[in-house]
């Protein structure tokens, strides 16, 4: 909004400054951070009063988690609010790619909110039926894919100019990437600070990737897909980082609030659509490797148990497996953060390695 206003009124100095995406990305990050820190305490108090018992805690989980009873959930409302307000100030509202990201963030956030609300009101672990939730996610993802997808070639990193033409099937692939990313982050969100920091790291990584993909000179030099307007995605990533850092302030152990499905689905879906829009879906699987590992651990656990009656892991998702092995919650979280940083560096290396 400020971007278009400055262009329309021809503000000297500020108009020149605001046209730089790097400046707007930094401003968006700081704005989202400040907004999140300001509204955070009020949101938490409101959620605590309205929810009473807070998020249901699994009885069959690690016994240390029982101390978290009474902690409110739906903290994702704070994240989405800070992210949205900062974007309205600094993004180019004419950008089709940013609107695709906004559709997924708000759409997935709403689905997550309904799921959280059902769990809190019934004080049960099962919220909205999985089939209903997934159907909603696929509808939202399909609309976002229609907005975000231009070329239908799948870019394969590391190999020089290797693209796999998928044609119309690319849209199906894009939808599965978006839905898969949303649910993978959702499965990761099981410990204080575990999901939000890897999301921040992934968003920071894709801010760099999106900016480079949006610049024809850099994209040509690096041999990566050039996506016109992709630089605006860096501003969206910056908003995710700022809002995420603000949430982490309150989610640091012992957490004062959980993001719930409201936040995890919104942020995961956003990462998915950003990767699709920037044509770096495979790189997302690398950068978000922690989320992939968490999701795969659940799939393997369920599949093997149904077939043999035996468990591969002591408990799934895999972060609970390490807790059952005797790792403290803080140890699991910090070590998983380190894994995320390493994976982000590997993801960035694919931009240059050929």
Swiss-Prot record:
UniProt cofactor(s): Mg(2+)
Subcellular location, record wording: Cell inner membrane
Keyword line: Cell cycle, Cell division, Cell inner membrane, Cell membrane, Cell shape, Cell wall biogenesis/degradation, Magnesium, Membrane, Metal-binding, Peptidoglycan synthesis, Transferase, Transmembrane, Transmembrane helix
Gene Ontology cellular component terms for the protein in this record: plasma membrane
EC category: transferase
Domain of life: Bacteria
Catalytic activity: UDP-N-acetyl-alpha-D-muramoyl-L-alanyl-gamma-D-glutamyl-meso-2,6-diaminopimeloyl-D-alanyl-D-alanine + di-trans,octa-cis-undecaprenyl phosphate = di-trans,octa-cis-undecaprenyl diphospho-N-acetyl-alpha-D-muramoyl-L-alanyl-D-glutamyl-meso-2,6-diaminopimeloyl-D-alanyl-D-alanine + UMP
Residues forming coiled coils: none
Pathway: Cell wall biogenesis; peptidoglycan biosynthesis
Transmembrane segments: 27-47, 73-93, 97-117, 138-158, 162-182, 193-213, 230-250, 256-276, 282-302, 331-351
Entries under InterPro entries matching the protein: Glycosyl_transferase_4, PNAcMuramoyl-5peptid_Trfase, PNAcMuramoyl-5peptid_Trfase_CS
Entry EC no(s): 2.7.8.13
GO biological process: cell division; cell wall organization; peptidoglycan biosynthetic process; regulation of cell shape
Family from the record: Belongs to the glycosyltransferase 4 family. MraY subfamily.
Gene this protein is translated from: mraY
Name under which the protein is recorded: Phospho-N-acetylmuramoyl-pentapeptide-transferase
Molecular function per GO: metal ion binding; phospho-N-acetylmuramoyl-pentapeptide-transferase activity; UDP-N-acetylmuramoyl-L-alanyl-D-glutamyl-meso-2,6-diaminopimelyl-D-alanyl-D-alanine:undecaprenyl-phosphate transferase activity
Membrane topology of the entry: Multi-pass membrane protein
Function: Catalyzes the initial step of the lipid cycle reactions in the biosynthesis of the cell wall peptidoglycan: transfers peptidoglycan precursor phospho-MurNAc-pentapeptide from UDP-MurNAc-pentapeptide onto the lipid carrier undecaprenyl phosphate, yielding undecaprenyl-pyrophosphoryl-MurNAc-pentapeptide, known as lipid I.
């Amino acid at each position: 909004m400020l971007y278009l206003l400055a262009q329309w009124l021809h503000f000297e100095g500020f108009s020149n400054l605001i046209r730089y995406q790097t400046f707007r990305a930094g401003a968006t990050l700081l704005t989202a951070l400040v907004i999140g820190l300001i509204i955070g305490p009020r949101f938490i108090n409101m959620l605590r009063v309205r929810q009473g018992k807070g998020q249901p805690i699994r009885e069959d989980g690690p016994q240390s988690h029982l101390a978290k009873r009474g902690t409110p959930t739906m903290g994702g409302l704070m994240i989405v609010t800070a992210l949205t307000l900062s974007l309205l100030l600094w993004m180019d509202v004419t950008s089709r790619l940013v609107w695709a990201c906004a559709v997924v963030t708000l759409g997935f956030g709403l689905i997550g909110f309904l799921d959280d609300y059902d769990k809190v009101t019934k004080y049960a672990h099962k919220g909205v039926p999985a089939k209903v939730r997934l159907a909603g996610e696929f509808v939202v993802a399909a609309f976002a894919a229609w907005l975000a997808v231009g070329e239908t070639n799948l870019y394969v990193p590391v190999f020089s100019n290797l693209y796999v033409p998928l044609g119309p099937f690319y849209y199906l692939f894009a939808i599965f990437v978006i839905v898969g990313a949303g649910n993978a982050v959702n499965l990761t969100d099981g410990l204080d600070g575990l999901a939000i920091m890897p999301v921040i790291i992934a968003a920071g990584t894709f801010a760099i990737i999106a900016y480079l993909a949006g610049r024809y000179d850099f994209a040509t030099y690096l041999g990566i897909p050039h996506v016109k307007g992709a630089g605006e995605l860096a501003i969206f990533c910056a908003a995710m980082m700022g809002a995420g850092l603000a949430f982490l302030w309150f989610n640091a152990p012992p957490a004062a609030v959980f993001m719930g499905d409201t936040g995890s689905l919104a942020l995961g879906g956003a990462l998915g659509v950003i990767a699709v829009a920037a044509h770096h879906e495979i790189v997302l699987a690398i950068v978000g490797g922690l989320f992939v590992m968490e999701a795969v651990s659940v799939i393997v656990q369920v599949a093997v148990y149904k077939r043999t009656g035996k468990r591969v892991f002591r408990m799934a998702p895999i972060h609970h497996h390490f807790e059952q092995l005797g790792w403290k919650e803080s140890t699991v979280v910090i070590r998983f953060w380190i894994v995320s940083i390493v994976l982000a560096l590997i993801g960035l290396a694919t931009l240059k390695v050929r």
